[in-house]
Every structure is written in C-alpha cells, then in structure tokens.
C-alpha cells in the first residue's frame, strides 16, 4: 500500500517535477482521500499512505513554488462507482465491518451531510480546476470533494 500510494507518488513527482521546474511551470494534482485527513478503522496502511501523500503534497508545494510549479492534493470521499475494482473494494470493506454490501453503501450515504455519494464527475471537475490556470494562485492546498464528510 505505502509503496504504490506514497512511494509511487514520490517517484512520479520527482520525475515530472524536474521537467516542470526546468520549464518553470506546471501543476501536479495528487489524488489522496478523506483517509488522508481522518482515520478509518481496519485500513491503517491505506490511511497512513494517504496521510503521507497529503504531507508530501504540502512539502513539495513549498519546494516547487519558487519555480512556478503548483502541487495540490485532491481528497475525494465516498464516490459512487460501478467499476469492478470498486465492487471488490466495497465487498472487502463490508466484510471487514461485518455487513452486506448494500447495507454498507447505505451507511456511507447516511454519513454524508448531503445524504448522497459523490459522483465521479464531481471529482474530475475539481481535478480539472486544480490543474487549470484558473487555480494558478493555489498551491499546497488540500481540496476535499466529500459531500461535507470532513466538515464535521
């Protein structure tokens, strides 16, 4: 978990960051998670990796800012997704909590102040904005797209 979600991000940032620093412009958007902001039972490795990614984002943003390179983190919450991967992940989470998949999804929905899961397009729109020139004054930020989950 740490090797892919944290070390992989570090290696990618180091590689593309050198190019962006040389050209004195660029935007890196790291996809973390609300697990990078709060803890979740039964997922210590994932939580550690995502907290690390948030910290890495802030540190690298400070390093790269003088060279015109922006680095931000996007922290999605519970996202509605019908992919095979998401199905397996939901099943694993449900099993760890001792509930069925349908019951698990309703628990996630009830935990959202908006009473709905985040849509994939909402996360994509935030990533697109962070990468765009419209966000040229934003670096070192942690942007949540979580239906208000972390506002509590």
What does each model-identified segment do?
Residues 1-11, 25, 29, 53:
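Catalytic Tyr-X3-Lys loop
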Residues 10-13, 17, 21, 114-145, ...:
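C-terminal substrate-recognition "lid" of short-chain dehydrogenase/reductases
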Residues 13, 49, 57:
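Active-site helix of classical SDR
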Residues 33:
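Residue(s) in the substrate-gating loop at a strand-loop-helix junction
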Residues 38-44, 66-67, 115, 133:
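Active-site loop immediately N-terminal to the catalytic Tyr-X3-Lys motif
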Residues 65, 70, 138-140:
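Short, small/polar-rich loop/turn modules that mediate ligand/substrate recognition or access, typified
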Residues 80-111, 122:
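A glycine/serine/threonine-rich, flexible loop-to-helix segment
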């Amino acid at each position: 978990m740490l090797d892919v979600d944290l070390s992989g991000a570090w290696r990618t940032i180091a590689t593309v960051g050198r190019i962006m620093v040389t050209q004195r412009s660029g935007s890196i958007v790291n996809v973390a998670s609300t697990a990078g902001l709060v803890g979740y039972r039964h997922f210590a490795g994932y939580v550690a990796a995502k907290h690390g990614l948030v910290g890495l984002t802030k540190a690298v943003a400070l390093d790269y800012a003088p060279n015109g390179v922006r680095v931000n983190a996007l922290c999605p919450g519970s996202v509605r997704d019908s992919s095979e991967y998401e199905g397996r992940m939901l099943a694993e989470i449900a099993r760890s909590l001792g509930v069925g998949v349908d019951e698990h999804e309703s628990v996630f929905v009830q935990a959202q102040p908006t009473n709905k899961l985040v849509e994939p397009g909402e996360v994509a729109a935030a990533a697109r904005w962070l990468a765009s020139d419209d966000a040229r004054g934003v670096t070192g930020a942690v942007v949540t797209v979580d239906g208000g989950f972390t506002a509590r």
